[in-house]
Amino acid sequence: MKKLMFALAASAAMVSFAEDNAELEKVDTPIFWGFGNYGIYSGYQLYGSLLNNEPTLQGYVEGNINLPGGFGYVGLGLWSNSDLTNRRRSGGLGQMFNEWDPNVHVGYTFWFDDNKTWGLDWRSSVVWYYYPAQDYKEMHPATDTTWDFDHSFALLNPYLIPYVNIVREYRFDANLFQFGVKKPIQITDELSICPFVEFVARDKDYNWCFPTQFGGIETCGGLATLKVELDTTYQITEHFGLFAKVAYCSIIDHHMRNSCDDILASDDYGENKDFVWGGVGVTFNF
């Protein structure tokens, strides 16, 4: 059985934090705020695809400034990865802290009622991917941005929260759509859980983190992966807590599954069509 890994993925953190921040806004409106997490993972999972099936350390931190007049916020974020084995290091990606992904972002919540229980949370960001060992930098000349331009939306409400993340990847002129539903549940004042189901769809040119990037596999795009996940958070103090996460991920695109069977039996991207993934770590906010 695969090792379990529990981690707080940055994309899920951003979606869920919108609801937490809404509660803060009901009480007070701070000028500066932020959050972060750091954990150990059973592997490097992205969009329901496993890029490395051996343990990694990954973390994310961001700081934000609320704009005057209640017009949302702007901020900076930084995600990092450290492979704990030589599986990907041998490919020239370096040792500890072999990936750094900074972002700049802006966000706003459009509330539909005075009690701030129903609303549409919006966030847009530009994400750069940087690998220090390769001095890696891919720039799109028309925009001077690297790789991803993301737009995220979540329909906040007391029941079931649908969300979508739209990713524009400039290097290959490709698009990806991440969408699902989640249900935050407060068990006690300290303990909360959040089950969710998530799908990923992409056009035929968005392949870099999927098995179809290898071997010239023909693909028409469409639904790519499915993820069913349970996140658990235990708040120890006002600003510090612990998290655990476990997920079942499955590649549902038949082109990808065929590529795993045909040519990728020994490659990280292809040997795990269906897998369990998870992690544990710490969370903080300020």
Positions of PLM-derived features:
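Cleavable N-terminal export/targeting peptides
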Residues: 1-33, 114-116
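Intrinsically disordered, low-complexity regions of eukaryotic proteins
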Residues: 2, 21-30, 64, 103, ...
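Short glycine/proline- and aromatic-enriched beta-strand/turn motifs that initiate or cap beta-hairpins
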Residues: 19-69, 73-88, 106, 277, ...
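Short helix-terminating capping/connector loops at secondary-structure junctions
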Residues: 29, 71-72, 117-119, 190-192
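Outer-membrane beta-barrel transmembrane domain signature
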Residues: 42, 65-70, 82, 110-113, ...
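Outer-membrane pore/translocation modules
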Residues: 51, 78-180, 264-270
